Regions:
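Pyridoxal 5′-phosphate
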Residues: 1-407
Length: 407
């Protein structure tokens, strides 16, 4: 495997222009965020925030400020409502498992949308080992949750409902407030959790206005460092801790806090919301230019998900018929354009995206899907370069597919 990777990297030598559009699975951290983080590794606030000495007190002060700043961006009431975790996946594990264990005397039913992210879906499935049942709520062809089916699914045994604010693959902006109201009217004791990683920094999102009990977000999806996320827990809601160990500044996540990454995440959140409207407008304009250019140059394409304001401004998911998404990803990589074929979580299993299957895409359409996400740091020149190399890459892959008789 290592040798194969070395050979693949050699093929990329000589690339002069690179455009990173795989912002679903990672992101390039801007220099201003890196610069903000660096001193906290070895020059200041490098102590354990629970210890009684200067470096510890410095770390405590910094982390408390970060709690406050991130809580404000989410619309949380208190800084104590926020728990920093080593990523979105860990935050979802804490939210779902912690809520289920705390709610087990109320009920043992979990209701989720059928297009939840893999890290939500798998945790919910895992809870079946502890006696919980799971019911999936269907979506329509654009990925919107069927609210009538949601109402039918929630009953007196429902402990937790999980619906992402924005779908990570097709960008569907769910009517979250309406969904929360339906759940609470049917069962006031049921908790409502939302993975807001693809809403955070892209659409207006306020936990208090929405009425959610739990929300999770990711650092790298707002151009912060990987390995950092956060969970919001509404004041007055009980959650069981799922990991044991030394308790620092957070009662729900043990261990020594990672001050540099917390600082980086906080700086990323500040920048994402500092010029929110302008950032969103730029992401949308670049995305629209990219999509319009692709559809102008190529035929046999399928747009996956909704359009307009009902979709996340950065998200573009296209099924390219007579082409295989993974092959196109490699072909574009050789030209310095980096995208994702569907969901990275599904790709390693060589299975079509469960999201695309749920919205009615055929097997070939799902396997021919690609996912691209723009950021506020991209330029018009970046999109121009992508549009320059994209059609020839697709035509080359289609030629290979056609010659092999694969469809």
């Amino acid at each position: 495997m290592v040798e194969n990777v070395k050979e693949l990297l050699k093929l990329h030598e000589g690339i002069t222009h690179e455009v990173y559009l795989d912002n679903e699975n990672s992101s390039i951290v801007p220099e201003e965020i890196v610069d903000e983080m660096l001193p906290y590794f070895n020059k200041k606030a490098y102590g354990n925030p629970t210890l009684t000495h200067k470096p510890g007190w410095e770390a405590f002060e910094v982390i408390m400020k970060c709690f406050g700043k991130v809580s404000q961006t989410l619309g949380a009431k208190n800084l104590e409502d926020i728990t920093f975790t080593p990523g979105e996946t860990e935050a979802n594990n804490l939210a779902i498992m912690g809520a289920c264990f705390a709610q087990k005397d109320i009920g043992k039913k979990i209701v989720i949308s059928e297009i939840e992210p893999i890290n939500v879906l798998q945790v919910a499935e895992m809870m079946e080992k502890f006696g919980f049942s799971m019911q999936k709520v269907p979506v329509n062809s654009e990925g919107f949750v069927d609210l009538e089916k949601l109402k039918e699914a929630v009953d007196s045994e429902t402990a937790l409902v999980c619906i992402s604010a924005v779908n990570n693959e097709v960008g569907t902006v769910q009517p979250l407030k309406e969904a929360v109201d339906i759940v609470k009217a049917k069962n006031p004791k049921a908790l409502f959790q939302t993975d807001a990683s693809d809403a955070y920094g892209r659409i207006p999102f306020d936990v208090q206005k929405l009425g959610v009990d739990l929300a999770t977000v990711s650092s790298y999806k707002i151009l912060g460092p990987r390995g950092m996320g956060a969970m919001y827990l509404r004041e007055g809601i009980n959650l069981e801790r799922i990991l044991e160990g030394q308790i620092g500044t957070q009662k729900l996540w043990p261990g020594v806090e990672n001050t540099p990454l917390i600082v980086g995440f906080t700086k990323a959140s500040e920048l994402a919301f500092q010029n929110f409207d302008a950032n969103v407008a730029k992401m949308r304009a670049l995305r629209d230019k990219l999509v319009d250019g692709i559809f102008k140059e190529l035929d046999d394409l399928r747009w996956n998900g909704p359009k307009g304001d009902r979709r996340s401004p950065d998200n573009a998911n296209i099924s390219i018929l007579r082409a295989e998404g993974e092959a196109l990803t490699i072909e574009l990589s050789l030209k310095g354009v980096y995208i994702s074929s569907g969901s990275a979580c599904s790709r390693r299993l060589l299975q079509p995206s469960h999201v695309l299957v749920a919205i009615g895409r055929r097997f070939s359409e799902a396997h021919g899907s690609i996912l691209m996400k723009t950021t506020r740091h991209m330029t018009e020149e970046d999109i121009d370069y992508v549009l320059k190399v994209f059609p020839s890459a697709v035509n080359r892959i289609r030629g290979i597919v056609g010659s092999t008789g694969v469809d």
